[in-house]
Amino acid sequence: MLFRSTLADQLAEARLDEDVKAVVLRVNSPGGSALASEVIWREMELLRQQKPVIVSMGDYAASGGYYISAPADYIFADKLTLTGSIGVFGVMFNLEKTLKNKVGITFDSAATSPAAGGMNSLRPLTANERKSIERSIDRVYTTFTNHVAEGRNIPINEVLNIAEGRVWSGTEALECGLVDQIGGINEAIGKAIELADIKEQHALYEFTAPMTPFEEWIDSMGLLYTKSWGLDYNIYAEPIREILSNNPIIMNNNGVQALVPGNMKINL
């Protein structure tokens, strides 16, 4: 999951620290908020202008995870890394029938203009609201694909041919030009030392330590707060309930999202 307030701040800290000669970013994310992706992408761009930036992909570096990886000087991926998923979507739920049928609650409203009470989840979207959301999604998608084209030095037409949400393994991504080499974190560190031309003895500093169980619990409170207001998965129809239960990130992010579609498993 992508959180702009933490990762972006850490990238800025690394950029401003004169003792940091190169940065290796370990990406293991299926994506998240499109806004968070853009904020982190901007920090990656600023960082790359001052020192080498290497990305090491874990199990996932898809959609928003690839969005923030694109500006890197060099990208490593494992053979079975799931990456790509260059695409965005927007979610707007209509709870009108759900609340009426499940809880017995109905709503009436009075508006002074067609735009008043816009994007109300208690009624269907109007035609203008739907068009507005579609335009927003199109703008984010165009920005996303342009970032990939610029960061990877790939013609935009080629990017569009491998985009549209398609998911690639690390091996396939290498063939597509989305990554530079198959390798892990050690290879990424070696490449960072090479690009920074570090000759003397060096030390590795980890900006982000793994979360403790308590920190993970606190991190999950956003979802718990959502449930505390009664927006539990069980009030939705079965198809939507299945999607939400497997993708809690959707419930915790508003607006357009750059997120890998669904949960994927590879059976060897």
Regions found by a protein language model. Name each.
Residues 27-31, 59, 180, 185, ...:
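A mature extracytoplasmic/lumenal domain signature
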Residues 34-39, 172-175, 217-221:
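Short glycine/threonine-rich loop-to-helix capping motif typified by GTGT followed
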Residues 1-98:
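Cleft-lining beta-strand/loop regions that shape enzyme active-site pockets
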Residues 96-195, 199:
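Charged, glycine-interspersed solvent-exposed loop segments at helix/strand-loop junctions
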Residues 1-12, 19, 26, 105, ...:
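Intrinsically disordered, low-complexity segments enriched in small/flexible residues
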Residues 59, 81, 113, 165, ...:
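Short, solvent-exposed coil/turn elements at secondary-structure transition points
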Residues 39, 82-95, 116-125, 218-231:
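Short flexible/disordered coil segments
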